[in-house]
Amino acid sequence: QSDVKFVSNLQDLILLVQQMQRAVVKAPWSSSGRGVRYLTAQMLQDPGFSRWAERIIEKQGGVTVEPYYNKVKDFGMEFEAIDGQIVYRGLSLFQVAKNAYTGNVLASEEEKEEILQSYVSHEQLEAISQHVCEVMQPALKGVYSGPFGVDMMVCAKEPGSKDVFINPCIELNLRRTMGHVALA
């Protein structure tokens, strides 16, 4: 994502969040949303946030800062890296409450595409999955073999707007995800 920045000090982090006004700050290595903070520029005054950010920067070398998107719907795509090739396994539709995973939709691929069709076409989904395969194949070849998932999001351009876009990579999970389990 071109709008995601990696910063390695608290001063740069504060500056970026002030510029964005609303941002998502993520630890590079975390799970289940525990390394994620949703911020407004006003929340930067919280000493608890500063302590958290400094600790992550010290232990992990930095944090990522990205815009806070106007989420309409969460979804993902599941893949597997096998013998240097990337295989698309299917869609993952899941629910999130208070920014934490709560469960997956158990449905056929056709039913999941039907749920998403008011936001994204079959052709767009195919193009996104193909692009992930093309990008991840050289990135993972000889480095990682196994399942992985890419969390994605349908976003409104403005709060409450019907004008939407797809963010094709909110997060990359180099592991078996609950989306893989739902596909089984």
Short names for language-model regions:
Residues 38-40, 164-169, 182:
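Nucleic-acid 5′ end/cap handling module spanning
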Residues 2-7, 22-49, 76, 98-116:
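Glycine-rich phosphate-binding loop of ATP-grasp-fold ATP-dependent ligases
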Residues 20-21, 47-101, 153-169, 173-177:
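Phosphate-binding site of ATP-dependent enzymes
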